[in-house]
Structures are given as C-alpha cells and as structure tokens.
Amino acid sequence: MKHLLVDISAHGFGHIAQTAPVLNLLAQHRPDLRITVRSHAPTEYLKQRILVPFEHHHIALDFGMAMFDAIRVDVPRSLAAYRDYHADWTRKVATEAEVMRALQPDLLLANVPYKSLAAAKLEGIPSVAMCCLNWADIYRHYAPEDAGSAAIHAQLPDAYNSAEVFLKLSPAMPMHDLHNTRELSCVAQTGVARRELLRARCGASAQ
C-alpha cells in the first residue's frame, strides 16, 4: 500500500481523536506511506493530532446531525438535510467515485462518512470504516419509518456494509444492521506527563 485516503467526519472532533493515533502509529511502521486526509476540520487542528506528513483536502463529506448546540439535535432540520443529501443518490455516489479515482488511493479509511464507502465500492477500492458510531443508527433513531425515509434507511447501512470491515471501537453503539463489524478496544492518544507545566498554569507550588 502506497497511498492511504482518510475521510474524517468533522461533526465534532471525536472522529479525529480516534483516527489520529492510528495514522501516527501506522506511519511509524510505514514511513513511506502517502496519506491524504479529507475533512472539513481546520488544518491547524488536524496537525495538532496527526503528527506525520499528510495532504489535507478541506471538504465536508457528511454533516452528521444539525445541532442547536453541543448536545441538542435539531431534528426537523437534520431530516430535511438527509433528504436533500440522498436526493439523486446514485448519481452522487458515481460523482464521488470519479473524484476518488483521480486520487488513486490503495485503501480508504473512513471515520465515518458513508458516501465515501459507497463510492469506493463502486470504484473497486478497498475500504475500512472505523468508529464507535454510525450515522445509519443515529438517523434511524430520529427518522420515522415512512415513505419519505425508506430509501435513506436502506442506503445508509448498505454503504457501511460495503466496507471490507467496520472496526467498531469500544465503547460503541450496537450496530445491529451492520454485518461486517469487528470489535476493538478503545483508541486514544497516549498522554504525556506535564506536571511542572500544570503547576505553573495553576499557580501551584511543588509541595
């Protein structure tokens, strides 16, 4: 593998926090690996977490859920956004597949945009999904089972199931509709002891 394409959701920074340690460790074993990261997150923040060279394409690959604030979901706006996002779904996946073909990756790692996975499948590019959650289950929680959402309820898990494997990081959602999951323990950046800096910032003495 020479070129890894990494698609990261920017719905909060937790997706980056899960993905960055994997990339940092992978680069230690494969220092010649070319990494392309596509995410709507700021480049400066990505560089704080991803400590190896990478090329950043600043684009939004999904939107997760529309939010009032950090914890409250704007359900009507979210459902409307999903209907718009999935309109003409087949064409959109084909367009994304063309973009991916131009990038020529050997593997896609997605945390956890799903259109990317569907496009990779169409283009014949191996793919791995990795996260503690997926938008299929979250959408199902909020969206009614009606004619307007039936296609979306099918397309979301189909996209995730198209990956070779979905690495389900603990603690995770159940993901009963996904048939390619493999459970892993949690992934996180290892901390560094900075006792003196902490004392200085807090104005605390060493005693």
Regions found by a protein language model. Name each.
Residues 139-207:
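A nucleotide-sugar donor-handling region in carbohydrate enzymes
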Residues 38, 59, 130-131, 169, ...:
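Generic beta-sheet signal
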Residues 33-87:
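Conserved nucleotide-sugar phosphate-binding/catalytic loop shared by glycosyltransferases and other
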Residues 1-52:
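N-terminal subdomain of nucleotide-sugar transferases
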Residues 44-52, 117-122, 173-181:
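Short loop/helix-cap segments at secondary-structure boundaries that form the rim of catalytic
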Residues 96-157:
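Conserved nucleotide-sugar donor-interacting segment of glycosyltransferase catalytic cores
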Residues 3, 106-107, 165:
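Structural motif
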Residues 39-44, 112-115, 168-174:
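Short, polar loop motifs at secondary-structure junctions
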